[in-house]
From Swiss-Prot:
A Pfam family the protein falls into: Peptidase_M24
Sequence ranges of Basic and acidic residues compositional bias: 685-696, 719-730, 900-915
Similarity comment: family membership: Belongs to the peptidase M24B family.
UniProt-listed Enzyme Commission number(s): 3.4.11.9
Binding site for Mn(2+) 1: 285, 435, 476
Record protein name field: Probable Xaa-Pro aminopeptidase PTT_10145
SUPFAM superfamilies: Creatinase/aminopeptidase (SSF55920), Creatinase/prolidase N-terminal domain (SSF53092)
Listed cofactors: Mn(2+)
UniProt keywords, alphabetically: Aminopeptidase, Hydrolase, Manganese, Metal-binding, Metalloprotease, Protease
Gene3D superfamilies hit by this protein: Creatinase/methionine aminopeptidase superfamily, Creatinase/prolidase N-terminal domain
Molecular-function annotations in GO: manganese ion binding; metalloaminopeptidase activity
GO biological process, one term: proteolysis
Role, per record: Catalyzes the removal of a penultimate prolyl residue from the N-termini of peptides.
Species of provenance: Pyrenophora teres f. teres (strain 0-1) (Barley net blotch fungus)
Length: 926
């Protein structure tokens, strides 16, 4: 080991700048998916410097009406920015801080024995290119906390239907229209990591195609071909297919997406095998058409195969950056028309006439290709084959301007295109397919093209019938667009190499796990510069667009400026024409550092508010806040802090201080002008009411003494016949009194409280009667004055209207003298109150209620108190009606209070039999 000494330090420092640094890329699990770089690319496409990106992962679910789990397939937009292929995860990217956070579900111990466990936070941090890992339960809190600290920034989600769990209050700040186009533009250009995965998927699929070619003469059914292909893919750790394999033999090849794969191969000429696997979520798409024998079964099959192969090779030769893909599609149609004219299938017209009529779409109904990546028909497909529609629209051939891939349009009347169509230009880093084909669909020909006079005149039926058994031919490869041309990622054999494998039965010795480092590709000479380049491609070196990094830190690290990168825009129309150039990551870092260095120092807080919190709740350092410890200190703090310091005052604090001052003024003024509140009865007022009641009892007793002298003495002198007539007259008098006082019955309420205890709530009626439980039964005696029981007290309040009734004026009261008349008037008032009590008790009898309340086993029913059953069996036996009344006691009593008198005298209700009045009646005595 070399000993470090101070003498050699200067020499080492002098040669330090000349040292060479070695960069290594590991082909091991340490080669992480570049999620952090993808997030930065999305931020650059969005063109924002602050905000939050939220993406949910695919949740785990079961099949419908089943307890078996459905096949899990991660959401591709989520995977592009996270690299995580686990269910029930979430992703959050803080743009300003450049922090990528992954939320994973917490491990459930009860499910580990069944499904295994997921990643722990430490494992996820080491596995994925992310900065932080939290459990999913913390998602709502973290996002709400971020939103509170960033009041004026937006949150970007993928779709308008997307929702952040527990964050519905943030909907006004959510942008659901900008994120998906930005990620789609980024996904169109693949980086080195993505290209490696697509190449790996192509290698595995190509080997599976070789195995099928080597064993095709052994199989007798389409299902066997599909099974062998999937067997090879699964054995190479590619357990998922990018799409359902298409193993179409004979006429089935005329169906573009045939997937039954269950018919026998006997009597068929060709098989069209369209199949490709996924590797780490990246797809491959390969199609090969081959004979089911060692040689071509017919001349017609060989002719169609050679025509399709010429279409594909011609289009592939012209793949390079800046080429408009739609032009290649039109060129493929022109080659197909020339070939079909030469074979005699098309006739009676020139290439231009058939081209304008769109008859070639009968044999080539789909587009030339599509993007491929995380999806087999990856994002950007619409841009690749799109048509920019202008105002002048003319009828054109539908075969020239397809709107959707594999969306057949069989009539020219259903498709229109502008005179100046525009589509996407190819860019470096794109991976596209080139898949021309010639098909003979009997259904499409019979129902759309042959009945149409526009197309039928160009089709030779006699020759067409000979080519119908061919079914269809399609050849498809996956190609990477490079700076100098293209690279074919598909290594599956075709042409003569394909026939050699079928004849020999040997798939070859291609090693899948270690593919060739230099796959077949078409390269330009090095001394020839490319004509058109995508933005950001260097003129000097062919370095990749993105370089995989280690796990990203919370803040971006210092990166070196690369002077050999220019950003010259593409010449001519392009997908990026008219767009301003997005800033690179290095420029973003420099801009962030400048802003960080230019931030002024935060002013110190007031000394008296050292440990206080601002009024507005936001502790920002660029403005001066108002602090408060108590409510009384608010005005003084606001006056002292507004004019102090050179920094600007916090607007929110000023608004809150002014609002509180106005509230104080309004409260102070309202206390002077507000009406006098209702006072609660005091002990002295209750004593006064008891004094008035005692005086009323004395008056009633005096009236009873007079009855002893007059009425009582006369009762001993009259006979039985007169006593009966008097009872009838008294009953008539009682009926008149009851009819006269019926209109005020609704103003009386009965309330039962213990003796000496005032009612809990003041009555809103004019009169209120309180009654002791278990009153003594008082028997009237002829020579004894009738004194009302002591437990009957009358609580009077100021009436809202006069209780005088004209019917009370003609009751026939005797007037012996002025004193007797006054006493009689007082007696009459007491008698009216007693009649009112009797009327109220009659109402209880009408409702079928027997109110027997005993002093030791009685509860006061309240609205908020449940009715309890007494433990006394005798009380329970004699109080059945009270038990029924208990559950709704308050409602029934309020119903009696508010029930008008007319409801008791309705004609449909039978009259109660009249009660014979006798002076000793117990009911009247009570």
């Amino acid at each position: 080991m070399e000993v470090l000494d101070a003498t050699g330090l200067a020499e080492r420092l002098r040669w330090e700048d000349n040292d060479y640094w070695l960069h290594l890329e590991a082909e091991t699990p340490f080669d992480k998916y570049p999620a952090k770089q993808h997030a930065r690319r999305v931020q650059a496409k969005l063109g924002i410097e602050d905000g939050l990106i939220y993406l949910p992962g695919q949740p785990a679910r079961n099949n419908e009406d089943s307890d078996m789990p459905a096949p899990f397939r991660q959401r591709r937009y989520f995977y592009y920015m996270s690299g995580c292929d686990e269910p029930d995860c979430h992703l959050m990217y803080d743009i300003r801080r450049d922090v990528l956070t992954l939320f994973i579900p917490r491990i459930k111990p009860e499910r580990v024995i069944w499904n295994g466990r997921g990643s722990t936070p430490a494992e996820a941090l080491a596995k994925y290119d992310i900065d932080q890992v939290h459990h999913s339960q913390d998602l709502t809190y973290i996002i709400q906390n971020w939103a509170f600290k960033h009041q004026h920034t937006s949150i970007y989600i993928l779709h308008p239907s997307s929702r952040i769990p527990g964050c519905d209050n943030l909907m006004p700040r959510i942008d659901s229209h900008s994120l998906q186009p930005a990620i789609s533009l980024c996904r169109m250009i693949k980086d080195d990591h993505e290209i490696k995965r697509i190449r790996k998927a192509n290698d595995i699929s190509s080997q599976a195609h070789r195995e099928v070619l080597a064993n095709i003469h052994k199989y007798k059914n389409e299902a066997q071909v599909e099974g062998l292909f999937m067997d090879v893919c699964i054995s190479q750790q590619a357990k998922q297919q990018a799409y359902d394999p298409i193993a179409a033999s004979g006429p089935n090849a005329g169906t573009l997406h045939y997937d039954a794969n269950n018919e026998d191969l006997a009597g068929r000429q060709l098989m069209c095998l369209d199949a490709g696997c996924e590797y780490e979520l990246y797809a491959s798409d390969i199609t090969r058409t081959f004979p089911l024998s060692a040689s071509w079964p017919s001349k017609e099959a060989e002719n169609i195969y050679n025509l399709v192969q010429r279409m594909q090779e011609t289009c592939i030769e012209r793949l390079e950056p800046g080429v408009r893909y739609l032009d290649l599609h039109i060129m493929a149609h022109q080659i197909a028309i020339d070939g079909l004219l030469r074979l005699g299938i098309l006739c009676n017209g020139t290439r231009e006439e058939i081209y304008k009529a769109g008859t070639s779409r009968a044999f080539f109904p789909h587009g030339l290709g599509h993007h491929i990546g995380l999806e087999v028909h990856d994002v950007g497909q619409a841009e690749l084959m799109s048509v920019r529609r202008g105002k002048p629209v003319y009828q054109q051939a539908p075969s020239l301007y397809p709107e959707n891939f594999h969306d057949p349009v069989y009539d020219s009347e259903t498709c229109h295109a502008p005179t100046d169509p525009q589509s996407s230009h190819l860019e470096e880093g794109m991976v596209v397919t080139v898949e021309p084909g010639i098909y003979f669909s009997v259904y499409a020909l019979q129902h759309f093209y042959l009945p149409s006079p526009i197309h039928s005149k160009f089709i030779n039926l006699e020759v067409l019938e000979r080519y119908l058994p061919v079914g269809g031919v399609r050849i498809e490869d996956d190609l990477l667009i490079t700076a100098n041309g293209h690279e074919n990622l598909t290594t599956a054999p075709k042409g003569e190499a394909m026939l050699d494998i079928i004849r020999q039965g040997n798939p070859g010795t291609t090693e899948i796990l270690n593919p060739s480092p230099t796959p077949p590709r078409r390269m330009r000479s090095e001394n020839r510069t490319p004509r058109l380049r995508a933005p950001g491609i260097s003129k000097k070196t062919l370095q990749p667009l993105l370089t995989p990094l280690a796990r990203a830190a919370t803040l971006p690290t210092e990166l070196r400026q690369q002077d050999d990168i220019d950003f010259e825009p593409i010449v001519g129309p392009s997908l990026f024409s008219g767009f301003s150039r997005a800033m690179t990551t290095e420029e973003k870092i420099q801009q962030w550092k400048q802003k960080r260095d230019s931030v002024p120092t935060a002013p110190s807080r007031p000394t008296k508010a050292k440990n206080l919190s601002p009024v507005c709740g936001e502790n920002t350092a660029n403005v001066q806040h108002v602090y408060m410890s108590t409510v009384s200190d608010l005005s003084s703090l606001s006056q002292s802090s507004v004019g102090s310091g050179s920094t600007s005052m916090c607007k929110n604090c000023g608004i809150l201080v002014q609002t509180l001052d106005r509230l104080r003024q309004n409260l102070s003024s309202s206390t002077q002008t507000s009406p006098k509140p209702m006072t609660v009865p005091t002990f002295e007022s209750r004593q006064k009411s008891h004094t008035v009641e005692e005086k009323h009892r004395e008056m009633v007793c005096t009236d009873s003494l007079l009855d002893k002298v007059s009425i009582g003495q006369s009762n001993r002198a009259i006979g039985p016949e007169e006593r009966r007539r008097k009872a009838q007259s008294d009953h008539h008098h009682h009926s008149r009194l009851k009819a006269a006082t019926g209109e005020v019955k609704s103003r009386f309420s009965t309330r039962y409280t213990p003796a000496g205890v005032p009612p809990l709530m003041p009555s809103h009626d004019q009169y209120s009667i309180t009654r002791r439980p278990n009153p003594e039964r008082m028997q009237p005696v002829a020579d004894t004055p009738i004194v009302p029981p002591r437990h009957l007290t009358y609580m009077t309040s100021t009436p809202q209207q006069s209780t005088e009734n004209p019917a009370l004026a003609d009751l026939g009261l005797p007037r012996a003298s002025a004193e007797i008349a006054a006493i009689r008037a007082t007696k009459q008032a007491g008698q009216e109150k007693l009649d009112t009590q009797r009327t109220t008790l009659d109402a209880f009898q009408d409702e079928g209620q027997r109110l027997v309340i005993r002093s030791r086993h009685r509860l006061i029913p309240q609205t908020s108190m449940p009715v309890l059953m007494s433990q006394n069996p005798y009380h329970h036996h004699s109080n059945r009606s009270h038990g029924r009344e208990g559950n709704n006691a308050t409602n029934k009593r309020s119903m009696i209070d508010s029930q008008p008198a007319e409801r008791r005298t309705r004609p449909e209700r039978p009259e109660r039999p009249a009660r014979d009045y006798v002076p000793g009646d117990e009911f009247l005595t009570r």
